[in-house]
Amino acid sequence: IKNKKIFKIDHGIYSDKEIVDPMILFSKKYENSIITMDTAFYFYNLTDIIPDKVYLATNRNSNTIKRENIIQVWVPKEKLNVGKEKIKVNGNTINIYNKERLLVELIRKRNQIPFDYYKEIINNYRKIVDTLDSYKIEQYIALYKNENTLGNIILREVY
């Protein structure tokens, strides 16, 4: 702010930087949303593929976000905040799912994801398996009806 320059980034959002990371921008704009899937996998270095859109989890009763660079993932209210963490990025706080919740989401959506991309992320999870909290994974799996199947796939694919 030395030069007294403030840039309007979006409606109601201003910054001292002309270019703002879309992940940070949309975390500010949609405060109740949570960074998920491809955006979160990239953030955690589980893939080197830079997502061209920001993936945001929102309450399934939320309004549709009408932006072409956002993929909105609707989640039931009772599951939305499970695994949510607040992380500081460049001085800004973002909501993002932890690695354990993302692993469960990855397994749940494995048939909707390109196989090579899925395998890359799974291989990177294998490298960090010792840092994962197994208890959290079990809790997140228990949220879904097919918990035995999900648990078996995670054991087979990652552990």
Place the predicted regions along the sequence by residue.
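Short polybasic/polar patches that bind polyanions
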Residues: I1-K2, Y42
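A short, conserved structural fragment
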Residues: K2-D10
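Nucleic-acid-binding surface
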Residues: I9-Y159
